[in-house]
């Protein structure tokens, strides 16, 4: 909640300031049965849309802003419908939310409707708050995030913690304070659309492949950047997932490789694997026509489904400007592999591909 004793020019939410403890350890969430709430949802979204004053599509293939809806007021049925809509649209944006002021336990309760909450291996949580919270804090007195992106560009599309055996599903990102003016947006990309944009024969080549996902590189960066102050709550995680997955509710196929965590394709030589992954990463990075860009203001809550999207921060605001947010990351199902199918005739319906003799 907003502190009643905010220092001049200090953070509005001091209870959500980041806490770094190099000695802290956390337990990983064990295997669990995931009952996706989207399965229970009414596809006409009566409970979710009941109070919506406006529904704005951010782009044709990704992102919807629901104006006038308070997440905190949604019934169980409304949260189920939220799960279905975010699976279909990739991400949902809610403005002017009282969610920011509900307190740790109520925030956890709402997010836990979508699955057990992940505990991060190196990013901070609040000092006196639950370990499930991930604090994103960039300001003149804490440049740790900015230092970790000391490259030409911070743009890096990824799935949060894809090396988990059951990676995240619907994920909550809540903006407490945003840079003045503009900047610090999140770009979200639809991986189902990214897969659809590939040629039919190439899609079939990807189906059935598996890839290694690991936290090794991010953990090595944490050690490089922060030395003895590094936070290493969990050992390196390594998991094998399908390259193409199927969403359990919508049944849409989506690419499931990302440049932060995907290391190699199983069974391929290093050169072959690197070549293929570079193509897929480039395809994702260049796919501006299946992305949306979310601009923040205090009280904005964005929910995206990480089984069908990837996202990237932008670091285009001035160093020293405060950007303060938290993330709650419900885990979901074991990734479902896509099965190779016979020609479904979809290519023949694409006039552009037919004209180029690509079918």
Swiss-Prot record:
GO terms for molecular function: 2-oxoglutarate-dependent dioxygenase activity; metal ion binding. The keyword Oxidoreductase applies. Substrate binds at residues 120, 327. 2-oxoglutarate binds at residues 186, 323, 327. Keywords: Dioxygenase, Iron, Metal-binding, Oxidoreductase. It comes from the Eukaryota. One of its GO terms (cellular component) is cytoplasm. InterPro entries: AtsK-like (IPR051323), TauD-like_sf (IPR042098), TauD/TfdA-like (IPR003819). Its EC number is 1.14.11.-. Pathway: Alkaloid biosynthesis. This is Alpha-ketoglutarate-dependent dioxygenase cnsM. It comes from Penicillium expansum. The lineage of its organism: Eukaryota, Fungi, Dikarya, Ascomycota, Pezizomycotina.
């Amino acid at each position: 909640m907003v502190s009643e004793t905010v220092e001049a020019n200090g953070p509005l939410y001091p209870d959500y300031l980041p806490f770094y403890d190099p000695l802290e350890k956390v337990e990983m969430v064990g295997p669990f049965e995931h009952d996706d709430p989207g399965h229970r949802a009414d596809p006409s979204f009566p409970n979710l849309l009941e109070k919506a004053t406006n529904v704005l599509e951010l782009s044709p293939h990704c992102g919807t802003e629901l104006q006038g809806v308070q997440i905190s007021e949604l019934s169980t049925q409304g949260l189920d419908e939220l799960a279905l809509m975010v699976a279909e649209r990739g991400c949902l944006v809610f403005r002017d939310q009282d969610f920011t002021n509900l307190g740790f336990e109520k925030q956890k309760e709402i997010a836990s409707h979508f699955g057990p909450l992940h505990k991060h291996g190196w990013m901070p949580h609040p000092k006196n708050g639950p370990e499930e919270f991930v604090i994103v804090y960039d300001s003149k007195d804490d440049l740790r995030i900015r230092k970790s992106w000391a490259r030409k560009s911070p743009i890096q599309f990824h799935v949060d913690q894809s090396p988990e055996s059951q990676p995240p599903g619907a994920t909550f990102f809540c903006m407490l304070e945003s840079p003045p003016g503009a900047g610090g947006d999140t770009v979200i990309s639809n991986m189902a659309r990214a897969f659809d944009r590939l040629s039919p024969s190439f899609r079939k080549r990807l189906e059935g492949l598996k890839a290694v996902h690991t936290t090794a590189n991010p953990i090595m960066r944490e050690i490089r950047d922060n030395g003895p102050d590094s936070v290493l709550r969990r050992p390196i995680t390594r998991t094998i997932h399908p390259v193409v997955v199927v969403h359990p509710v919508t049944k849409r196929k989506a690419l499931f490789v990302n440049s932060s965590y995907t290391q190699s394709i199983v069974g391929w030589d290093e050169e072959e694997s690197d070549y293929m992954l570079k193509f897929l990463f480039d395809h994702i990075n260049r796919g501006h026509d299946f992305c949306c860009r979310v601009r923040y203001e205090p009280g904005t809550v964005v929910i995206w489904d990480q089984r069908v999207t990837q996202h990237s921060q932008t670091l285009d605001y001035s160093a020293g400007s405060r950007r303060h947010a938290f993330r709650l990351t419900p885990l979901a199902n074991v990734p479902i592999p896509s099965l190779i199918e016979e020609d479904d005739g979809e290519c023949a319906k694409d006039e552009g591909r037919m004209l180029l003799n690509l079918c």
